[in-house]
Amino acid sequence: MKRVLSNVLKAWIFTIVAFHNFSTSVTADAPVNAAEYNALCRLYNIARAGEGLKEEDWLPCAGKAACEKTAASIEDVFMKLNFSEPSAVVTTLDGTRVELQNSASTRIKRAKLAKVLAAAETIKAQQLKYHESSKSLLESAKANFTKAIVGGWGNPTTPDESGLPTTFKTNRADDCKLAGGNGGKSLVFDIACLCTTSDSASGSKYTCGPKSGDNGSGWLDNNGDNQGKPAAKEAWKNLRADCRRQSAGVRVTPELISQSLVIFEGLIGTRAASGHDNARYIFGTVATAQSCGHSTATNKGSIDYKASNAQQRGDIEWEKNLRMAEGDLRGLLTAKQLVAALQARAEHLEDAAFTIFNESVLETQIAWESSRPPSTDANTSQKGPLQRPEKSGESSHLPSGSSHGTKAIRSILHVALLM
Protein backbone atom coordinates (compact mmCIF):
# COMPACT_ATOMS: atom_id res chain seq x y z
CA MET A 1 0.00 0.00 0.00
CA LYS A 2 2.83 2.37 0.92
CA ARG A 3 4.52 1.62 -2.41
CA VAL A 4 1.31 2.41 -4.34
CA LEU A 5 0.86 5.70 -2.50
CA SER A 6 4.50 6.54 -3.10
CA ASN A 7 4.17 5.90 -6.85
CA VAL A 8 1.00 8.02 -7.03
CA LEU A 9 2.72 10.83 -5.16
CA LYS A 10 5.73 10.65 -7.49
CA ALA A 11 3.45 10.81 -10.53
CA TRP A 12 1.66 13.90 -9.22
CA ILE A 13 4.95 15.59 -8.33
CA PHE A 14 6.30 14.84 -11.82
CA THR A 15 3.17 16.28 -13.44
CA ILE A 16 3.23 19.44 -11.31
CA VAL A 17 6.93 19.98 -12.02
CA ALA A 18 6.40 19.31 -15.72
CA PHE A 19 3.56 21.84 -15.89
CA HIS A 20 5.80 24.33 -14.10
CA ASN A 21 8.61 23.69 -16.56
CA PHE A 22 6.22 24.14 -19.48
CA SER A 23 4.91 27.44 -18.11
CA THR A 24 8.31 28.85 -17.20
CA SER A 25 9.80 27.83 -20.55
CA VAL A 26 7.15 29.83 -22.43
CA THR A 27 8.49 33.38 -22.37
CA ALA A 28 6.72 36.57 -23.35
CA ASP A 29 8.45 36.46 -26.73
CA ALA A 30 7.45 32.86 -27.44
CA PRO A 31 4.60 32.06 -29.83
CA VAL A 32 1.20 31.74 -28.21
CA ASN A 33 1.16 28.02 -29.04
CA ALA A 34 4.57 27.23 -27.46
CA ALA A 35 3.17 25.03 -24.66
CA GLU A 36 1.12 22.99 -27.12
CA TYR A 37 4.06 22.66 -29.48
CA ASN A 38 6.35 21.50 -26.67
CA ALA A 39 3.77 18.94 -25.52
CA LEU A 40 3.37 17.44 -29.00
CA CYS A 41 7.12 17.42 -29.67
CA ARG A 42 7.75 15.69 -26.36
CA LEU A 43 5.31 12.92 -27.30
CA TYR A 44 6.78 12.76 -30.81
CA ASN A 45 10.27 12.22 -29.38
CA ILE A 46 9.03 9.60 -26.94
CA ALA A 47 7.50 7.73 -29.88
CA ARG A 48 10.70 8.06 -31.92
CA ALA A 49 12.75 6.67 -29.03
CA GLY A 50 10.17 3.90 -28.61
CA GLU A 51 10.70 2.77 -32.19
CA GLY A 52 14.30 1.94 -31.29
CA LEU A 53 13.75 -0.08 -28.11
CA LYS A 54 16.22 -2.98 -27.87
CA GLU A 55 15.58 -6.59 -26.91
CA GLU A 56 18.47 -6.70 -24.45
CA ASP A 57 16.88 -3.86 -22.46
CA TRP A 58 13.29 -5.11 -22.42
CA LEU A 59 13.14 -8.89 -22.84
CA PRO A 60 13.18 -10.93 -19.61
CA CYS A 61 16.11 -13.06 -20.79
CA ALA A 62 19.08 -11.47 -22.52
CA GLY A 63 18.68 -14.03 -25.29
CA LYS A 64 16.96 -17.42 -25.34
CA ALA A 65 20.08 -19.23 -24.06
CA ALA A 66 19.96 -17.26 -20.81
CA CYS A 67 16.57 -18.79 -20.01
CA GLU A 68 17.98 -22.29 -20.59
CA LYS A 69 21.31 -21.92 -18.80
CA THR A 70 20.37 -23.04 -15.28
CA ALA A 71 18.38 -26.08 -16.40
CA ALA A 72 21.32 -27.09 -18.62
CA SER A 73 23.65 -26.85 -15.62
CA ILE A 74 21.37 -29.11 -13.55
CA GLU A 75 21.10 -31.57 -16.44
CA ASP A 76 24.90 -31.72 -16.61
CA VAL A 77 25.06 -32.59 -12.90
CA PHE A 78 22.35 -35.22 -13.36
CA MET A 79 24.21 -36.83 -16.26
CA LYS A 80 27.31 -37.24 -14.08
CA LEU A 81 25.30 -39.58 -11.83
CA ASN A 82 23.23 -41.16 -14.59
CA PHE A 83 25.24 -44.36 -15.21
CA SER A 84 24.23 -48.03 -15.00
CA GLU A 85 27.65 -49.72 -14.81
CA PRO A 86 29.11 -50.80 -11.44
CA SER A 87 31.20 -47.65 -11.43
CA ALA A 88 31.95 -44.57 -13.48
CA VAL A 89 34.68 -41.96 -13.44
CA VAL A 90 33.30 -38.45 -13.15
CA THR A 91 34.94 -35.05 -12.99
CA THR A 92 33.96 -32.94 -10.01
CA LEU A 93 33.30 -29.23 -10.20
CA ASP A 94 36.87 -28.47 -9.14
CA GLY A 95 38.30 -30.71 -11.87
CA THR A 96 39.07 -33.78 -9.73
CA ARG A 97 38.38 -37.19 -11.32
CA VAL A 98 36.51 -39.53 -8.97
CA GLU A 99 35.31 -43.11 -9.47
CA LEU A 100 31.70 -43.21 -8.26
CA GLN A 101 30.00 -46.49 -7.44
CA ASN A 102 26.55 -47.31 -8.76
CA SER A 103 25.43 -48.10 -5.25
CA ALA A 104 21.96 -47.99 -3.73
CA SER A 105 22.83 -44.59 -2.30
CA THR A 106 23.86 -43.29 -5.73
CA ARG A 107 20.62 -44.55 -7.25
CA ILE A 108 18.62 -42.75 -4.55
CA LYS A 109 20.49 -39.54 -5.26
CA ARG A 110 19.95 -40.03 -8.98
CA ALA A 111 16.20 -40.24 -8.35
CA LYS A 112 16.36 -37.04 -6.30
CA LEU A 113 18.31 -35.31 -9.03
CA ALA A 114 15.75 -36.44 -11.60
CA LYS A 115 13.04 -34.64 -9.62
CA VAL A 116 15.20 -31.54 -9.33
CA LEU A 117 15.86 -31.62 -13.06
CA ALA A 118 12.16 -32.05 -13.85
CA ALA A 119 11.33 -29.02 -11.70
CA ALA A 120 14.06 -27.01 -13.44
CA GLU A 121 12.75 -28.01 -16.87
CA THR A 122 9.28 -26.81 -15.88
CA ILE A 123 10.73 -23.47 -14.83
CA LYS A 124 12.70 -23.25 -18.08
CA ALA A 125 9.53 -23.83 -20.10
CA GLN A 126 7.80 -21.02 -18.20
CA GLN A 127 10.75 -18.69 -18.72
CA LEU A 128 10.85 -19.41 -22.45
CA LYS A 129 7.11 -18.82 -22.69
CA TYR A 130 7.49 -15.37 -21.11
CA HIS A 131 10.49 -14.70 -23.34
CA GLU A 132 8.56 -15.46 -26.54
CA SER A 133 5.45 -13.52 -25.48
CA SER A 134 7.68 -10.58 -24.54
CA LYS A 135 9.14 -10.53 -28.04
CA SER A 136 5.61 -10.10 -29.38
CA LEU A 137 4.89 -7.35 -26.84
CA LEU A 138 8.05 -5.48 -27.80
CA GLU A 139 7.20 -5.63 -31.50
CA SER A 140 3.68 -4.44 -30.72
CA ALA A 141 5.02 -1.51 -28.69
CA LYS A 142 7.38 -0.45 -31.48
CA ALA A 143 4.59 -0.71 -34.06
CA ASN A 144 2.31 1.42 -31.89
CA PHE A 145 5.03 4.05 -31.50
CA THR A 146 5.49 4.18 -35.27
CA LYS A 147 1.76 4.48 -35.89
CA ALA A 148 1.53 7.33 -33.37
CA ILE A 149 4.08 9.22 -35.46
CA VAL A 150 2.89 8.49 -38.99
CA GLY A 151 -0.73 7.39 -38.50
CA GLY A 152 -2.24 4.88 -40.86
CA TRP A 153 -0.62 6.55 -43.83
CA GLY A 154 2.60 4.61 -43.61
CA ASN A 155 6.15 5.86 -43.58
CA PRO A 156 7.15 6.98 -47.10
CA THR A 157 10.79 7.30 -48.04
CA THR A 158 10.45 11.09 -48.31
CA PRO A 159 10.87 12.33 -44.70
CA ASP A 160 8.93 15.54 -45.35
CA GLU A 161 5.82 13.51 -46.21
CA SER A 162 6.11 10.91 -43.45
CA GLY A 163 3.09 11.21 -41.17
CA LEU A 164 1.05 13.40 -43.50
CA PRO A 165 -2.30 12.30 -44.96
CA THR A 166 -2.34 10.57 -48.30
CA THR A 167 -5.60 12.41 -49.02
CA PHE A 168 -6.28 15.92 -47.71
CA LYS A 169 -9.70 17.48 -47.21
CA THR A 170 -11.00 20.48 -49.13
CA ASN A 171 -9.76 23.05 -46.61
CA ARG A 172 -7.78 23.50 -43.43
CA ALA A 173 -10.84 23.64 -41.16
CA ASP A 174 -11.94 20.20 -42.37
CA ASP A 175 -8.43 18.77 -42.22
CA CYS A 176 -7.35 19.95 -38.77
CA LYS A 177 -10.27 18.56 -36.80
CA LEU A 178 -10.93 15.25 -35.11
CA ALA A 179 -14.49 14.54 -36.27
CA GLY A 180 -14.42 13.65 -39.96
CA GLY A 181 -11.00 15.18 -40.52
CA ASN A 182 -7.38 14.14 -40.35
CA GLY A 183 -6.75 15.69 -36.94
CA GLY A 184 -5.58 13.32 -34.23
CA LYS A 185 -4.43 10.66 -36.69
CA SER A 186 -0.69 11.31 -36.43
CA LEU A 187 1.58 13.44 -34.28
CA VAL A 188 3.31 14.79 -37.38
CA PHE A 189 0.09 16.05 -38.94
CA ASP A 190 -1.15 17.61 -35.69
CA ILE A 191 2.15 19.50 -35.35
CA ALA A 192 1.75 20.74 -38.94
CA CYS A 193 -1.82 21.86 -38.19
CA LEU A 194 -0.78 23.59 -34.98
CA CYS A 195 2.07 25.46 -36.61
CA THR A 196 0.56 26.72 -39.91
CA THR A 197 -1.22 30.02 -39.73
CA SER A 198 -3.73 30.36 -42.55
CA ASP A 199 -5.47 28.84 -45.55
CA SER A 200 -4.31 31.54 -47.90
CA ALA A 201 -0.96 31.69 -49.66
CA SER A 202 -0.77 35.42 -49.02
CA GLY A 203 1.53 35.41 -46.04
CA SER A 204 0.92 31.78 -45.06
CA LYS A 205 3.36 31.06 -42.24
CA TYR A 206 4.59 28.28 -40.03
CA THR A 207 5.12 29.45 -36.46
CA CYS A 208 6.11 27.21 -33.56
CA GLY A 209 8.80 27.35 -30.94
CA PRO A 210 11.68 29.54 -32.13
CA LYS A 211 10.95 28.74 -35.77
CA SER A 212 8.83 30.71 -38.20
CA GLY A 213 8.86 31.29 -41.93
CA ASP A 214 6.95 31.35 -45.19
CA ASN A 215 5.12 28.19 -46.22
CA GLY A 216 5.14 29.24 -49.87
CA SER A 217 1.53 28.16 -50.30
CA GLY A 218 -1.66 27.95 -48.30
CA TRP A 219 -4.12 25.17 -47.65
CA LEU A 220 -6.43 26.32 -50.48
CA ASP A 221 -3.96 27.45 -53.12
CA ASN A 222 -3.49 24.24 -55.07
CA ASN A 223 -6.17 23.05 -57.43
CA GLY A 224 -7.40 19.48 -57.29
CA ASP A 225 -6.88 16.84 -54.64
CA ASN A 226 -4.48 17.17 -51.72
CA GLN A 227 -4.27 20.95 -52.12
CA GLY A 228 -3.28 21.35 -48.46
CA LYS A 229 -0.33 18.99 -48.71
CA PRO A 230 2.34 21.48 -49.86
CA ALA A 231 1.67 23.81 -46.91
CA ALA A 232 1.68 21.00 -44.35
CA LYS A 233 4.76 19.44 -45.93
CA GLU A 234 6.67 22.73 -45.90
CA ALA A 235 5.78 23.41 -42.27
CA TRP A 236 6.88 19.96 -41.10
CA LYS A 237 10.08 20.07 -43.17
CA ASN A 238 11.12 23.30 -41.46
CA LEU A 239 10.06 22.29 -37.95
CA ARG A 240 11.14 18.66 -37.85
CA ALA A 241 14.74 19.22 -36.68
CA ASP A 242 13.69 21.76 -34.05
CA CYS A 243 10.94 19.49 -32.74
CA ARG A 244 13.39 16.63 -32.36
CA ARG A 245 15.60 18.81 -30.18
CA GLN A 246 12.79 19.57 -27.73
CA SER A 247 13.07 16.28 -25.83
CA ALA A 248 16.06 14.61 -27.45
CA GLY A 249 17.55 11.62 -25.67
CA VAL A 250 14.45 10.66 -23.69
CA ARG A 251 14.46 7.28 -21.96
CA VAL A 252 11.11 5.65 -22.65
CA THR A 253 9.17 4.26 -19.70
CA PRO A 254 5.44 3.60 -19.20
CA GLU A 255 5.40 6.33 -16.55
CA LEU A 256 6.93 8.89 -18.92
CA ILE A 257 4.30 8.14 -21.57
CA SER A 258 1.45 8.42 -19.06
CA GLN A 259 2.73 11.63 -17.48
CA SER A 260 3.40 13.28 -20.84
CA LEU A 261 -0.13 12.45 -22.01
CA VAL A 262 -1.51 14.00 -18.81
CA ILE A 263 0.29 17.23 -19.74
CA PHE A 264 -1.10 17.09 -23.27
CA GLU A 265 -4.66 16.43 -22.10
CA GLY A 266 -4.41 19.29 -19.61
CA LEU A 267 -3.98 21.69 -22.55
CA ILE A 268 -7.15 20.61 -24.37
CA GLY A 269 -9.89 23.20 -24.08
CA THR A 270 -8.02 25.27 -21.50
CA ARG A 271 -5.83 27.78 -23.34
CA ALA A 272 -7.52 30.52 -25.34
CA ALA A 273 -6.60 30.90 -28.99
CA SER A 274 -6.07 34.67 -29.10
CA GLY A 275 -5.93 36.13 -32.59
CA HIS A 276 -7.97 33.36 -34.22
CA ASP A 277 -10.88 33.99 -36.53
CA ASN A 278 -12.82 30.91 -35.52
CA ALA A 279 -10.97 28.97 -32.83
CA ARG A 280 -11.80 29.33 -29.15
CA TYR A 281 -8.93 27.13 -27.96
CA ILE A 282 -5.51 26.25 -29.37
CA PHE A 283 -6.26 22.62 -28.59
CA GLY A 284 -9.99 22.82 -29.18
CA THR A 285 -12.68 20.78 -27.54
CA VAL A 286 -16.44 21.28 -27.22
CA ALA A 287 -16.95 24.97 -27.95
CA THR A 288 -19.22 27.26 -29.90
CA ALA A 289 -18.06 27.78 -33.48
CA GLN A 290 -14.73 26.07 -32.88
CA SER A 291 -12.89 25.88 -36.19
CA CYS A 292 -9.27 25.92 -37.26
CA GLY A 293 -9.76 27.51 -40.66
CA HIS A 294 -8.03 30.89 -41.00
CA SER A 295 -7.74 33.52 -43.67
CA THR A 296 -4.96 35.88 -42.54
CA ALA A 297 -1.34 35.43 -41.61
CA THR A 298 -1.84 36.98 -38.16
CA ASN A 299 -3.99 34.06 -37.03
CA LYS A 300 -2.30 31.19 -35.20
CA GLY A 301 -2.77 27.50 -35.83
CA SER A 302 -4.99 25.22 -33.81
CA ILE A 303 -6.36 21.68 -33.76
CA ASP A 304 -10.05 21.00 -33.20
CA TYR A 305 -10.17 17.96 -30.91
CA LYS A 306 -13.97 17.92 -30.57
CA ALA A 307 -16.24 15.23 -31.98
CA SER A 308 -20.01 15.14 -32.55
CA ASN A 309 -20.79 17.78 -29.91
CA ALA A 310 -19.28 15.59 -27.20
CA GLN A 311 -15.83 15.60 -25.72
CA GLN A 312 -14.00 12.63 -27.26
CA ARG A 313 -10.38 12.89 -26.21
CA GLY A 314 -10.05 9.12 -26.40
CA ASP A 315 -10.68 9.28 -30.15
CA ILE A 316 -7.30 10.85 -30.84
CA GLU A 317 -5.71 8.01 -32.79
CA TRP A 318 -2.08 8.70 -31.97
CA GLU A 319 -2.98 8.94 -28.27
CA LYS A 320 -4.62 5.51 -28.48
CA ASN A 321 -1.42 4.16 -30.04
CA LEU A 322 0.72 5.63 -27.25
CA ARG A 323 -1.62 4.20 -24.62
CA MET A 324 -1.33 0.77 -26.24
CA ALA A 325 2.46 1.10 -26.34
CA GLU A 326 2.39 2.05 -22.67
CA GLY A 327 0.40 -1.11 -21.93
CA ASP A 328 2.86 -3.20 -23.93
CA LEU A 329 5.79 -1.83 -21.93
CA ARG A 330 4.03 -2.47 -18.63
CA GLY A 331 3.48 -6.06 -19.78
CA LEU A 332 7.19 -6.36 -20.56
CA LEU A 333 8.17 -5.11 -17.11
CA THR A 334 5.77 -7.58 -15.48
CA ALA A 335 7.26 -10.44 -17.52
CA LYS A 336 10.76 -9.45 -16.41
CA GLN A 337 9.69 -9.56 -12.76
CA LEU A 338 8.06 -12.97 -13.17
CA VAL A 339 11.09 -14.42 -14.95
CA ALA A 340 13.41 -13.01 -12.27
CA ALA A 341 11.35 -14.82 -9.62
CA LEU A 342 11.50 -18.03 -11.66
CA GLN A 343 15.24 -17.64 -12.06
CA ALA A 344 15.69 -17.38 -8.29
CA ARG A 345 13.81 -20.67 -7.92
CA ALA A 346 15.91 -22.27 -10.67
CA GLU A 347 19.13 -21.22 -8.95
CA HIS A 348 17.85 -22.71 -5.69
CA LEU A 349 17.30 -25.99 -7.53
CA GLU A 350 20.78 -25.73 -9.00
CA ASP A 351 22.24 -25.41 -5.50
CA ALA A 352 20.29 -28.50 -4.45
CA ALA A 353 21.64 -30.43 -7.46
CA PHE A 354 25.23 -29.51 -6.64
CA THR A 355 24.68 -30.53 -3.03
CA ILE A 356 23.35 -33.98 -4.03
CA PHE A 357 26.24 -34.54 -6.41
CA ASN A 358 28.86 -33.45 -3.88
CA GLU A 359 27.33 -35.75 -1.28
CA SER A 360 27.95 -38.67 -3.66
CA VAL A 361 31.55 -37.57 -4.10
CA LEU A 362 32.07 -37.30 -0.35
CA GLU A 363 30.57 -40.73 0.24
CA THR A 364 33.03 -42.15 -2.27
CA GLN A 365 35.90 -40.39 -0.55
CA ILE A 366 34.84 -41.62 2.89
CA ALA A 367 34.45 -45.19 1.60
CA TRP A 368 37.87 -45.04 -0.06
CA GLU A 369 39.56 -43.69 3.07
CA SER A 370 37.83 -46.31 5.24
CA SER A 371 39.11 -49.14 3.03
CA ARG A 372 42.78 -48.10 3.31
CA PRO A 373 45.03 -49.71 5.90
CA PRO A 374 46.07 -47.24 8.58
CA SER A 375 49.32 -45.46 7.82
CA THR A 376 52.11 -45.28 10.37
CA ASP A 377 53.90 -42.44 8.65
CA ALA A 378 51.90 -39.27 8.14
CA ASN A 379 54.52 -37.97 5.74
CA THR A 380 54.14 -40.89 3.37
CA SER A 381 50.40 -41.43 3.63
CA GLN A 382 48.57 -41.48 0.32
CA LYS A 383 45.73 -39.11 -0.39
CA GLY A 384 42.38 -40.14 -1.78
CA PRO A 385 40.92 -39.26 -5.13
CA LEU A 386 39.39 -36.08 -3.72
CA GLN A 387 40.93 -33.66 -1.23
CA ARG A 388 38.68 -31.89 1.18
CA PRO A 389 39.24 -28.13 1.12
CA GLU A 390 40.78 -26.75 4.27
CA LYS A 391 38.23 -23.94 4.42
CA SER A 392 34.63 -23.90 3.35
CA GLY A 393 34.24 -22.37 -0.07
CA GLU A 394 37.75 -23.07 -1.38
CA SER A 395 36.39 -25.67 -3.79
CA SER A 396 33.47 -24.60 -5.97
CA HIS A 397 30.17 -26.00 -4.62
CA LEU A 398 32.04 -28.64 -2.57
CA PRO A 399 31.08 -28.83 1.13
CA SER A 400 33.97 -28.68 3.60
CA GLY A 401 33.23 -32.07 5.12
CA SER A 402 30.62 -34.52 6.25
CA SER A 403 29.38 -31.98 8.79
CA HIS A 404 27.38 -30.55 5.90
CA GLY A 405 25.21 -33.54 6.71
CA THR A 406 22.52 -35.57 5.06
CA LYS A 407 19.91 -33.80 7.17
CA ALA A 408 20.91 -30.40 5.81
CA ILE A 409 21.06 -31.75 2.26
CA ARG A 410 17.59 -33.26 2.57
CA SER A 411 16.33 -29.97 3.96
CA ILE A 412 17.71 -28.05 0.99
CA LEU A 413 16.31 -30.57 -1.46
CA HIS A 414 12.94 -30.60 0.26
CA VAL A 415 12.64 -26.82 0.06
CA ALA A 416 13.78 -26.83 -3.57
CA LEU A 417 11.23 -29.43 -4.60
CA LEU A 418 8.45 -27.48 -2.95
CA MET A 419 9.25 -24.33 -4.95
UniProtKB/Swiss-Prot annotation:
Residues 395-405 have a biased composition (Low complexity). GO terms for cellular component: plasma membrane; side of membrane. It comes from the Eukaryota. It is a lipid-anchor; GPI-anchor. A lipid is attached at residue 400 (GPI-anchor amidated serine). Residues 372-384 have a biased composition (Polar residues). Residues 1-28 form the signal peptide. Pfam families: VSG_B. Residues 401-419 form a propeptide. Residues 369-405 are annotated as: Disordered. Glycans are attached at residues 82, 358, 379. It is found in: Cell membrane. Keywords: Cell membrane, Glycoprotein, GPI-anchor, Lipoprotein, Membrane, Signal, Trypanosomiasis. Its main location: membrane. VSG forms a coat on the surface of the parasite. The trypanosome evades the immune response of the host by expressing a series of antigenically distinct VSGs from an estimated 1000 VSG genes. This is Variant surface glycoprotein YnAT 1.1. It comes from Trypanosoma congolense.
